[in-house]
Amino acid sequence: GCLDIGKTCKDDCECCGCGNVCYCPFDWFGGSWQPFGCSCAYGLKYVCAHKQKKCPNV
């Protein structure tokens, strides 16, 4: 299976669909940027080519 938008992920290949990426925003916390956690988000069209090369299941 694959992960829908908004689900927690570790890698682009886990996210459903060709155009969705695993996005890891950074948050300003305690005087430094900290990873806020990754979730599937809609990427741009160029993501598709990247995922087709990288991910066997796309």
Curated annotation (Swiss-Prot):
No toxic effects on mice at dose levels of 5 ug per mouse. May be toxic to insects. Expressed by the venom gland. This is U8-ctenitoxin-Pr1a. Disulfide bonds join C2-C16, C9-C22, C15-C40, C24-C38, C48-C55. The keyword Secreted applies. Belongs to the neurotoxin 09 (Tx3-6) family. GO terms for molecular function: ion channel regulator activity; toxin activity. Keywords: Disulfide bond, Ion channel impairing toxin, Knottin, Neurotoxin, Secreted, Toxin. The keyword Secreted applies. It comes from the Eukaryota. One of its GO terms (cellular component) is extracellular region. It is found in: Secreted. The presence of a 'disulfide through disulfide knot' structurally defines this protein as a knottin. It comes from Phoneutria reidyi (Brazilian Amazonian armed spider).
